[in-house]
Amino acid sequence: LVMNTLLATGDAPLSAGFLAWRAMCADKPDFDVGRLLGRGNPHLGVDECAAYDAPFPDDTYKAGARVFPTLVPISTDYASAQENIEAWKSLRKFDKPFLTAFSDSDPVTAGGERYFQREIPGCAGQAHTTIVNASHFLQEDAGEEFADVVNKFVASTK
């Protein structure tokens, strides 16, 4: 099961939303993780946003979060491009049940589910889902609905 993700190989352009997120992570002086999550999930309360901040007591702990987007290959020159190409070679042979559950309002990964569905044999015949009125973090935007999707998928594979 994949949700709101991509496995870039550097040979196709990434979305404007992804590139904006990448630039923001690199350039924004006040990199407040809780506030970032709160902007995309306005229903999160102060305590929930604070919980997302908890692993980052100061900026030195945020290096991984800042660097993470730069690991996604934007050209085939990236080391991770070759790793992802190899992963796709395996996924293109994967014939076990494979489900996509994406949201309708994620500016970074919108439409990415179609590639997974087209390329992975195990996607055939699955109850792929687009969760409506949800953004990138499905567990926050539509936690119960997403859990129901996962539970039904697991039950269908027994």
Stretch-by-stretch model annotation:
Residues L1-V132, Q139, F153-T157:
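Flexible "cap/lid" subdomain of the alpha/beta-hydrolase fold that forms the substrate-access gate
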Residues A134-A147:
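Catalytic histidine-centered segment of alpha/beta-hydrolase-like enzymes
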